[in-house]
């Protein structure tokens, strides 16, 4: 039973899941919009929104906290200096998920995840 289980395992070990979320976040920050499976998009939404909330402060400690999660200088700088300031007056809901199609090979539900304009 999965009573009160707080996250999706996505069929991966914890380290693989952490690496997956980190890589998806870097891709989302760099391109602004990515297509992935719906469960991955839903997990990514929570991960990214926590990072943006932290990055909104824009100070040195925010840079360090975001870099600790992403380990990528370019994505960290873009998130803290370009993306997060756009959401200065918004309390959460920085991303949106749009269901797109059913993938032909395995019938997985696909979705776009992007930043709210």
From Swiss-Prot:
Instruction: Identify the keywords attached in UniProt to this record, alphabetized.
Output: Ribonucleoprotein, Ribosomal protein
Instruction: Read off the Pfam families from this record.
Output: Ribosomal_L17
PROSITE patterns this protein is in?
Answer: RIBOSOMAL_L17
Matching entries from InterPro entries are given as: Ribosomal_bL17 (IPR000456), Ribosomal_bL17_CS (IPR047859), Ribosomal_bL17_sf (IPR036373)
Which superkingdom is the protein from?
Answer: Bacteria
One of its GO biological process terms is:
translation
One GO MF term attached to the UniProt entry: structural constituent of ribosome
Recorded GO CC terms: cytosolic large ribosomal subunit
Instruction: Give the UniProt family note.
Output: Belongs to the bacterial ribosomal protein bL17 family.
Question: Could you give the subunit structure recorded for this chain?
Answer: Part of the 50S ribosomal subunit. Contacts protein L32.
What name goes with this protein? Large ribosomal subunit protein bL17
Which gene specifies this protein's sequence?
rplQ
């Amino acid at each position: 039973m999965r009573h009160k289980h707080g996250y999706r395992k996505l069929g991966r070990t914890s380290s693989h899941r952490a690496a997956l979320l980190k890589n998806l976040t870097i891709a989302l920050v760099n391109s602004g919009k990515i297509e992935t499976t719906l469960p991955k998009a839903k997990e990514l939404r929570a991960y990214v929104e926590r990072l943006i909330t932290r990055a909104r402060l824009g100070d040195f400690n925010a840079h360090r906290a975001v870099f600790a999660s992403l380990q990528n200088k370019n994505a960290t700088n873009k998130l803290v200096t370009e993306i997060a300031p756009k959401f200065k007056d918004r309390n959460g809901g920085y991303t949106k998920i749009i269901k797109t199609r059913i993938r032909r090979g395995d019938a997985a539900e696909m979705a776009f995840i992007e930043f709210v304009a």
